[in-house]
Amino acid sequence: MPNLSFVIPAYNEQDSLAELHQQIATVAADNSYDFEIVFVDDGSTDDTWKIIESLSTANENVKAIMLRGNYGKAAALRAGAKMSTGDLIITMDADLQDDPAEVPKMLAALTDDFDLVSGWKEVRNDPVNKTMPSKVFNWLVGLLTGVRLHDHNCGFKVYRREIFDEVKLYGEMHRFVPVLAAAKGFRVTEIPVNHRARQHGVSKYGLKRLPKGFLDLLTVSFLTGFNQRPLHLLGMFGLATFSVGAFGMFAMAIYWILRMVAYPEWTPLHQRPVVLYSVGLLILGTQLLSMGFLAELIVAKGQSREEPYSIAKKLE
């Protein structure tokens, strides 16, 4: 069995970490896994780091990183994966909702046919204000990217190391790793996993994520579909804008002819506010979208050269 690296971001999860470590260690011992755990404290304000320090002191296969601030899950995963040494990387949340007992089943699914196994919380122990938006989000991701999973948001995943070597996470792109990996030719599958009710603390996510998630989805759709050929996308917007302008010019030309012939009392088309505002907004919206996508492309390319986080401490 290849050696395993559990990469676990944690933000204010002081009450869960010791129990999670014990559960992972039990599963690893029962299956004779050669493993390590990399905890990443993402700027916690409680005693999360103290618990991690004590676990690292007592267990030589527990490593840890403390980030200087709350950089988000994507940055924490990137930092943890960089520190890890395993051939396979297992990511899971620190809140005990992901069940380590599912690891053998997930590893069994990672055959020669697949490079990433994503968990699917088929039966979720979450309130409806989390489950319904998640269903809509997963449907939209499948529609726009072609990567159809039931649960893109599930943090419980098994990766071949090469995925983290080639897919550079930044912002809040952690939920789109299957999409980004598939765009690079990696093979992705999904299996149902047990999802447990939260035992300690409170959820760090809610409805406020939806607008950001949708914008990130548009970004990923652009990066995976037009990364190497942005002119295909920007050209379509340009053609649409040109067509609107051409139609306006044509309409004014027809108007001018009619006015000269029979309707001198008509208000000139170019003096009608609705038309002027509509054309102006169309052009402005196209310019803003184009600049936004180009900025995202520049950021995505730049992330391969600069880490999106700052490390305060390491325990190796």
Q: What annotation goes with each model-predicted range?
A:
Residues 176-316:
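Hydrophobic helical membrane-anchoring modules
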Residues 13-28:
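Short, well-formed alpha-helical segments that are part of the catalytic scaffolds
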Residues 3-5, 36:
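Cell-envelope/extracellular polymer assembly enzymes that use nucleotide-activated donors
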Residues 15-19, 46-55:
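Acidic helix N-cap motif at the loop->helix transition within catalytic regions
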Residues 21, 25, 33-43, 65-66:
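Short beta-strand/loop segment that forms part of the nucleotide-sugar
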Residues 63-69, 73-83, 88, 97-183, ...:
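Acceptor/aglycone-binding surface of glycosyltransferases and processive sugar-polymer synthases
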Residues 41-50, 96-97:
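A conserved acidic beta->alpha catalytic loop
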